Amino acid sequence: TTHKNIPIKNIYYMLAYAFKEIKSVDDERIKGEEFENIYDLFAEILAKGVSYLLKQGLHKEYIAKHEIISTLKGKLNLQETIKEELAKRLRLACEYDEFTINNIYNQIIKSTIFILLSQNDVKAERKQKLRKLMLFFDEVEKINLKTIKWKSLRYDRNNRIYQFLHKICEFIVLSKLFSTEEG
């Protein structure tokens, strides 16, 4: 199967070779399948990659939070508490760090999967797989992928699999931005 005269499997092999992540997204299963188009292939790669991520555990990081709450949590912002007269209402302005999966790495994946779910080119069975995986991303917010600064993302040995998956996501986002087709 080809996409604008390029065999789809060749695209997969080029990506896998470039990122040396071929084993982590279950190459043998993908090799034997036929894909009608590039988005169907990417949906399968993301489904496999996200399944692998879930087994490893989704990336978590500390995110700074600022809340007005009834009990002290983290650091008290005394100036805001006084200025807003929060103490009269038994409330405190607090700043703290939260260890969460709601970070840019997971937000990119969730938002890209939503793009794939809206594509007519993706087979129903693959959409079903992606929907099941989305249950694990309930705490993760969707973001506008057009605003992502892809080159500023940093990867280490603990989140290296994200680099391969994010390149797939970036390709999907860019192809949708510059697509001349409807949808």
Name what the model sees in each region.
Residues 1-155, 160-179:
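Terminal, charged accessory segments of proteins
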